[in-house]
Amino acid sequence: MLTFLIPTAKEMTTPKESHPHLLPQDSQAILKIMTAMTTEDLAKSYRIKEEAAKKEQQRWQDMASQQSLAYPAYQLFNGLMYRHIKRDKLTTQEQAYLTQQVYITSSFYGIIPANHPIAEHRHDFHTRIKIEGQSLKSYWRPCYNQFAKEHPQVISLLSSEFDDVFSKDCKQLWISPKFMAEKEGQFKTHSTISKKARGAFLTACMENNCQTVDSLKSLVFAGFYYHPDLSTDYEFVYIKKEA
């Protein structure tokens, strides 16, 4: 069985379905630090204006006082990649695929199933805090490595900020899809292409119920197709021709 890892997103939208918010034990130490930060501290940590930091501060305070609602993570996050993932009108098989084989890597919650209930928050591995004298990446590394050991065949749709959260020896069987546009024989990639394609790729995997590495090679989605000459055992390259 394939396991997919996807990142969080800064952009969020409030879904209709909500749940009580239950915070994992490992997240409690981070919450304690975040709620102790002033608006000015948060603005510096997030590199945002103080007005925006006030909103984030209120979210942390609501979490600490157990006033927050929680929403299925894959519905709450609404960045470019998430908007290209099929999230509505799923078949029973697609819903099972999404909730059992897709996991979200979070700097606040750890690694969670795609439908895990989470509260609105802003937090990533660029957030400048120390937990028990450790960086966020060092703090989460044991948890992340344990997940990798339990799920050796991972399809990683993660961005570069996650590269060194996992130890190298835990990623030996990982495959990282790469998405490129071809125009007049020239190949290019950029953030927008990659984010849209990650969502479309995951949707195609769900719709086709991909369960083997070889099945990924036959996928055609949003104009992309597998390119064997540019691919390696650990990096699958998908090309889209541009006019």
UniProtKB/Swiss-Prot annotation:
Name of the molecule in the record: UPF0246 protein SpyM51747
Which PANTHER family does the UniProt entry name for this protein?
A: PEROXIDE STRESS RESISTANCE PROTEIN YAAA, PEROXIDE STRESS RESPONSE PROTEIN YAAA
Task: Give the highest taxon in the source lineage.
Answer: Bacteria
Q: Which InterPro entries match?
A: YaaA
What family does this belong to?
Belongs to the UPF0246 family.
Q: Name one GO cellular component term.
A: cytosol
Q: Name its GO BP terms in alphabetical order.
A: response to hydroperoxide
